[in-house]
Amino acid sequence: MSGRVLLGGRDSVPLRGTWAVLHRVTRQSAGPIDSVRTDTAGRYRMQLQRPRAAADSGAVYVVSTWHDSLAYFSLPLNVQGRTAVRVEDLVVYRTTKGTPPIELARRLVTLGLPGADGTREVLEILELQNTGLSTRITDDTLVPTWSGAIPPSAIQFQAGQGDISGEAIKRVGDRVFVLGAIPPGQPKQLTYGYTLPAGGGRFAIPIDQATRDLNLLVEDTVAAVEAPGVESLGVQPVEDRRFAAYRAGPLAPGDRVTIGLPRGPFRPQMLVPYVVGLLGAGMLGALVWALRRKPLASGPATP
């Protein structure tokens, strides 16, 4: 298999002399199996041995490289039945702290009907865009690479999995902190959920930063949604339920977005058929994963 390692910037250039490492991942084990340094053109070539056992035939292979304190990985490689495998270019970046700015490109908020105890589950999926030419990092848990506001009344916060690992997401007061690296390129998704206590009459979504697009999925089709330039996308029947979809944006810090809180049970899995058309494949994978997560355990509220 062969590929290139490039140093990203205004013009990507070959990265000479860096290690390209081939990894094999099976159900039983995972680890590097070969490595080579790139040449003057940033190219590398490695020989992949044919599987020695039936268990190895289901192995997944990836190529990684390391630059400026960060590891970069290729997508999983399809090697079955192929004599040559071309790996996508691995583009690495220098790292910086505090810059470049991270934009909130898209925010999806899903609000369900109250459960038997009156609480309501909220799921959010966000897309963050690094607008610069370097990967933003942090080494201080009090200085996140990005942060955003959530309702002060939210309890039982739980980070999900996306492009940004749930382990790199935490709640600090009324904010969500991202501590993971955010490289340039395609927007990176993060997912989290929380519970709204019973008794609230309206759900206010805090807008603390510029947001290009805001999508809302509300299970109550007659809920009063208020937002600057809000657009109704209609009501979609899904089995025995109906969901109202809305779009707003671009939004400025301080813009007011509120939703009247309905009543009734919420089965989030029913959202999936509609979301296919509304969001497309990009956000759908994250939404499906998040909605299939185990329900939040009942217990004391977390700050």
Name what the model sees in each region.
Residues 1-303:
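Lumenal/extracellular ectodomains and adaptor appendage modules
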